[in-house]
Amino acid sequence: MRSKFKDEHPFEKRKAEAERIRQKYADRIPVICEKVEKSDIATIDKKKYLVPADLTVGQFVYVIRKRIKLSPEKAIFIFVDEVLPPTAALMSSIYEEHKDDDGFLYITYSGENTFGN
């Protein structure tokens, strides 16, 4: 999936911003969170997050649920490189494995358990 954030901001600018964030907040992870295009779930109001390194994927999902005001009975799935990460995994380990060349971790979310084909 194409990232709108990547389309809107040139690589050098993104890279410089991620480096600045990592220097200033060494214990935080710069995350870009965007909705899977064809999903009927609510669009998030904020794409950029600075999450604690020791936050779990499950805790991050909770943050996203609150931001989009998702009711408890509705499902939400997040993807990193088109794969569902383990709920108990730390954001720091997901970041180390999947961070983009620009230094950001790109996460997409959907109301469906499939990666929008």
From Swiss-Prot:
Pfam families registered for this protein in UniProt: ATG8 (PF02991)
GO biological process: autophagy; protein transport
Record-annotated site: Cleavage: 116-117
Lipidation (Phosphatidylethanolamine amidated glycine): 116
Signal peptide: none
Keywords tagged on the record: Autophagy, Cytoplasmic vesicle, Lipoprotein, Membrane, Protein transport, Transport, Ubl conjugation pathway, Vacuole
A GO CC term attached to the entry: autophagosome membrane
InterPro entries (UniProt xref): Atg8-like, Ubiquitin-like_domsf
Role, per record: Ubiquitin-like modifier involved in autophagosome formation. With ATG4, mediates the delivery of the autophagosomes to the vacuole via the microtubule cytoskeleton. Required for selective autophagic degradation of the nucleus (nucleophagy) as well as for mitophagy which contributes to regulate mitochondrial quantity and quality by eliminating the mitochondria to a basal level to fulfill cellular energy requirements and preventing excess ROS production. Participates also in membrane fusion events that take place in the early secretory pathway.
Protein name per UniProt: Autophagy-related protein 8
